[in-house]
Amino acid sequence: MIAASAALLCASAALAQKGETVKIAWLDPLSGLMAAVGTNQLKTYQLIAEDFNKKNTSGVKFEIIGIDNKLSPQETTSALRSAMDQGARYVTQGNGSGPALAIIDALEKHNARNPGKE
């Protein structure tokens, strides 16, 4: 997970303009049975972004937008909309195939409705 997070940050930095803030939506459970796992993962992502922000010289900053999806596909779709409204252009999720499929479906529909704004 840490290697994947670092790769995402590096790839995002390569595409971003100097001074830009890259917003990454983190959609996983922060409540219910998986709350402890989700809380730990979110803190990890935030620490990676914080560390990268301190060390990076490109002027690109990273912000993790953590949203509780309650491990529900429906909540995940709502969380994705909220994250996109907050300016997130990247999304990460790791717990549950139902939420993952909801993200894929929502992004495919969004991209079809908004060509060129993927």
Predicted regions and their residues:
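Bacterial N-terminal signal peptides that target proteins for export
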Residues: M1-A3
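N-terminal signal peptide c-region/cleavage motif recognized by signal peptidases
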Residues: A11-A13
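Cleaved targeting-peptide boundary
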Residues: A16-V22
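Beta-alpha junction/loop-to-helix N-cap segments that form part of ligand/metal-binding clefts
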Residues: T21, A36-N40, K55-E118
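Acidic/histidine-rich, surface-exposed loop or edge segments in extracytoplasmic proteins
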Residues: A25-L33
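Short catalytic helix/loop segments, enriched in acidic residues and glycine
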Residues: L42-N53
